[in-house]
């Protein structure tokens, strides 16, 4: 007798513990994949997604899928393998191979946004192309294309008014500037008068001798 191939439901029974432990972290992504493949219906998805416990959510999911038949179990195992291993390196650009960036876009589902091909050559109409910038003359040309603000003419007018006296001096270099008037000297303060010395007291006159008394003495 040859080896009999194991059915998907038997694989789930054998690896139930490992599946529950492995799929707890990514149970939400697994539910999304099963809904997209038509394994789960909308009400079933909402009922499982509302469970707060991740372990309980995965256990209920395995039982529900096993009740749907071998085809549903096979889709579950395929989605679980893709969810856990993540073979597409789109989320890790450090390990992207050389051909991944140049791969062609896969046909999208109807109703979804389709990215434009890299070779379309469409550019934003508001941004100038590199060739247009070279024709203008690089950054200098871009400055020349910028509109001037109304404040610039006023600044230029003030600058021309301030330069007129300098131009007149350059045109008449022989004209000497007028000498500035010398400041008048301040008057010197008058010296204060010296105080007059006090007059010395006059000596009292000596009394004159009484000549009459002398005459009387001589007569006697």
Curated annotation (Swiss-Prot):
GO terms for molecular function: calcium ion binding; caspase binding; cysteine-type endopeptidase inhibitor activity involved in apoptotic process; death effector domain binding; death receptor binding; identical protein binding; signaling receptor binding. Residues 111-220 are annotated as: Disordered. One of its GO terms (biological process) is negative regulation of oxidative stress-induced intrinsic apoptotic signaling pathway. Phosphorylation at Thr-149 is required for its antiapoptotic effect by blocking death-inducing signaling complex death-inducing signaling complex (DISC) activity through the control of interaction with CASP8. Phosphorylation at Thr-149 results in translocation to mitochondria and this translocation enables the binding to CASP8. Dephosphorylated at Thr-149 by calcineurin; doesn't inhibit the association between FADD and CASP8 and the consequent apoptosis. Disruption phenotype: Mice homozygous for the NOL3-null allele are born normally and externally indistinguishable from littermates of other genotypes. NOL3-null mice grew to adulthood without any abnormalities in their general health and appearance under resting conditions. Under biomechanical stress, NOL3-deficient mice develop accelerated cardiomyopathy which is characterized by reduced contractile function, cardiac enlargement, and myocardial fibrosis. Likewise, under ischemia/reperfusion injury of NOL3-deficient mice have a markedly increased myocardial infarct sizes. It holds the Pfam family CARD. The keyword Lipoprotein applies. Apoptosis repressor that blocks multiple modes of cell death. Inhibits extrinsic apoptotic pathways through two different ways. Firstly by interacting with FAS and FADD upon FAS activation blocking death-inducing signaling complex (DISC) assembly. Secondly by interacting with CASP8 in a mitochondria localization- and phosphorylation-dependent manner, limiting the amount of soluble CASP8 available for DISC-mediated activation. Oligomerizes (via CARD doamin). Interacts (via CARD domain) with CASP2; inhibits CASP2 activity in a phosphorylation-dependent manner. Interacts with CASP8; decreases CASP8 activity in a mitochondria localization- and phosphorylation-dependent manner and this interaction is dissociated by calcium. Interacts with TFPT; translocates NOL3 into the nucleus and negatively regulated TFPT-induced cell death. CARD is critical for both extrinsic and intrinsic apoptotic pathways. CARD domain mediates a protective effect against myocardial ischemia/reperfusion, oxidative stress and TNF-induced necrosis. The C-terminal domain (amino acids 99 to 220) is involved in calcium binding and plays a protective role in calcium-mediated cell death. This is Nucleolar protein 3. It comes from Mus musculus (Mouse). The gene is Nol3.
